[in-house]
Amino acid sequence: MIVIPAIDLKDGQCVRLRQGLMEDTTVFSSNPIEMATQWVEQGARRLHLVDLNGAFEGRPVNSTSITEIVSAFPDLPVQIGGGIRNIKIANTYIEAGVSYLIIGTMAVTDSEFVSELCREFPNKVIVGLDANNGFVATKGWVQKTNLNVVDLSKKFEQDGINSIIYTDIARDGMMQGMNVEAIVNLAKQISIPIIASGGITNIGDIIRLLTEVHFGIMGVITGRAIYEGTLDFKQAQQLCDEN
């Protein structure tokens, strides 16, 4: 299992939101590439970048910061989400060197878009599903749906997506611990690898996930915990490597 540092971009700055609310923002750095360098120097094997403005506006907004990071670390896999709403945008990111495209809202509202992306960019598409009490939310978590996250995930098994990022909205940015039960429940019922996200607080969450890693949990995304220091990134990755 790999530990993936999150770099959430808003107005060119590195921030974290609480429960996906744009008005509840903490700025951790005004220099995203400096932030990326810090995690790379600590041994990050992948970076998770999110264009928060893009997620809300439906188009790339922080693409300059994203391409700068990708260019600075050409051998490092980078996954990007937020505002990827058509093939042209996806192609621009792939040509810039992005390794994986994260599709959130469009995966829920237009499943054919995911199928098309998978045909165009094999093994480079990650579906990001944000859920609250087992039901999917879209449009930067603003819009709740009546779609069950397990049922929706199963629909992507035939497309050949790389993985699913499962984020528990109720826990994200709240530093209350991960909802491991919900993550494992999803992982058990689908064949697609899972990247867990939302609520990681300390090394205890890593330990709990590692006991369930055989169900197909390939990675965990962490943001606020590594920025506020309640989780030591190097220690977390070392623990994963030893198990």
Curated annotation (Swiss-Prot):
MF terms (GO), sorted A to Z: 1-(5-phosphoribosyl)-5-[(5-phosphoribosylamino)methylideneamino]imidazole-4-carboxamide isomerase activity
Record-level GO BP terms: L-histidine biosynthetic process; L-tryptophan biosynthetic process
Protein name stated in the entry: 1-(5-phosphoribosyl)-5-[(5-phosphoribosylamino)methylideneamino] imidazole-4-carboxamide isomerase
Gene that encodes the chain: hisA
Cellular component aspect of the GO annotation: cytoplasm
EC supergroup of this enzyme: isomerase
Enzyme Commission (EC) number: 5.3.1.16
Family: Belongs to the HisA/HisF family.
